Amino acid sequence: QKEVAQRLPEKSQDETEAQPSASRINSKLEIPVMLTKREEIKLQRTGYTVSYNNFYKTPNWVAWELTRQETKGSEERKNRFVPDPDLPEPRVEHADYTRSGYDRGHMAPAADMKWSKKAMEESFYMSNICPQNQKLNRDDWGDLEELCRSWARKYGTVHIACGPIYDKKQPKRIGEHRVAVPDRFFKVVLIYNRKSPIAMGFLFDNKAHHQAPVSYTHLRAHE
C-alpha cells in the first residue's frame, strides 16, 4: 500500500494579511486526482500541496492557488534549500545538485510565496525541486511563472499544477541520493473565476533551446 502523508499548515504570526482563508485550504480546486500507479507521498504546505515520489526523488506534481493579494507580498527569498523534514530518510539534500549542471528548479516558485515567511521557507524544501536545465529554468519556465502572476493580478485568482515527466524507464540520476532528471515538464493553469473559465496546458523539454509559445499545448475554454 502506498504511503500517503498529510500535514495541514499551521497558522503563523509571520503571515501577512494575505494569508489563505479557510475556504482556500478546504476547496483545493487545483489538486489533481490521487495517483494509483505511481508512488506518492502527499504533503500539504502553507502555500502549496506536493505529491512526492520517493523513487524518482522528485515531486509527481505540485499544486497551488495564487491570488491577486498574494502577488503583493514582500517576503524576500533566502535561497536556503533544505531537505524536507516530513519525508522518510534518506532525503534529498542541497548538495545532490552541486556541480551537476542542473539548476535546483522550483515547481511552486518562491516568487509566488512572498505573502508568508513560512510559505517562502517551505518553497525551498527539496521536495519542491527538480533538476532543471539552467536555461529553461531562467528563461522559458521563469517567463511562464511571471505570466501566471500577471494573470493572478488581472483575474484575481489562478490555480496552477506542474511537475516532471519521465519518458525513460531508467532516467539519468544525479547526486548521492540519485535524483532522477526529468525529460520534460508540464504546467496546467486554470483561471476559473470569470464568466468563461480558461484552462491552459504547457509542455517543456528539459533542454537549453528556446521553446516558442506556439510549441506549447493549449487547452482553452470559450472566452
Question: Where does each model-flagged region fall?
Answer:
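Domain-level detector for secreted/extracellular nuclease and nuclease-toxin modules, and
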Residues: 1-220
